[in-house]
Amino acid sequence: IFPVISIIQIFMGVGLLLGVFLDPVGLMQPFFKGEISADLIFFSQGIIDVTAMHMIGVGLFIFSLWRLKFDNESNKKIFLAYSVFAGTVLLVALFNHLFRGGGPPIPILILIVSATALGLYGSRKAID
């Protein structure tokens, strides 16, 4: 479970970085009406790159915890802590989809749900 969650987190972060720097207008167009100015792109890149690096950092953190080979009870606590983190991210994503007319694209939402479910599964089964 550790490497799968790690890969999901890193994949989402790298995808966000690629999207915001290779095609910022294409990434932002669904959320803005009218022309997207260079100032708006610059402002958004400054926020999105921090968010993306946070995702990558969490992925690397989870990967390093996997490599430390904790006992199953410790793994259970790690997965529970990750589930709380991922659940918070999921709540924000769902709120944005339902009430704000935005949120992550559906494939990313599926990855967030998958990572949260894997964390919950790991917290119950206490496996690595």
Give the location of each predicted region.
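Membrane-water interface at the C-terminal end of transmembrane alpha helices
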Residues: S114-D128
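N-terminal membrane topogenic signal
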Residues: I1-I5, S123-A126
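Hydrophobic alpha-helical transmembrane segments of polytopic
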Residues: F2-I8, T51, I78-A86, I108-L111
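Core segments of alpha-helical transmembrane spans in multipass integral membrane proteins
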Residues: L40-R67, V84-T88
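Aromatic-anchored segments of alpha-helical transmembrane domains
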Residues: F11-G15, F85-L94
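Loop-to-transmembrane helix junctions at the membrane interface
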Residues: W66-Y82
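Hydrophobic transmembrane helix segments
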Residues: I8-M53
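Membrane-helix boundary connector in multi-pass membrane proteins
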Residues: L90-I108, S123-A126
